[in-house]
């Protein structure tokens, strides 16, 4: 199983100002393929940051 570093962008709309708040996270996950690694990272982000509305993996790199 390979290890991947997956960068995930989390976003939510602030109701007070109707503006978009964005935070970027990075996870290192073990997975057999890049697609599964991306899915795992998004799932971890959803569990840890429930206050965000959208999650998008924007970069994935295979680690040695």
Language model features by range: what are they?
Residues 1-24:
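Short aromatic-glycine-(Arg/Gly/Cys) micro-motifs in beta-strand/loop hairpins
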Residues 4-10, 29, 59-62:
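Short beta-strand element of the conserved SAM-dependent methyltransferase core
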Residues 13-15, 34-36, 62:
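Generic "edge-of-domain/loop-turn" microfeature
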Residues 16-18, 37-41, 55:
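Generic marker of "main functional regions" within proteins
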Residues 20-36:
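A short, exposed loop/beta-hairpin motif centered on an aromatic-Gly-Thr core
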Residues 33-47:
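Short, intrinsically disordered low-complexity segments
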Residues 43-64:
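Short, mixed-charge low-complexity intrinsically disordered segments
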């Amino acid at each position: 199983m390979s290890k991947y570093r997956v960068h995930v962008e989390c976003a939510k709309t602030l109701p007070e100002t109707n503006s978009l708040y964005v935070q970027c996270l990075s996870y290192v996950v073990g997975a057999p393929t890049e697609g599964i690694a991306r899915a795992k990272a998004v799932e971890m982000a959803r569990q840890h940051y429930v206050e965000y509305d959208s999650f998008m993996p924007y970069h994935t790199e295979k680690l040695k």
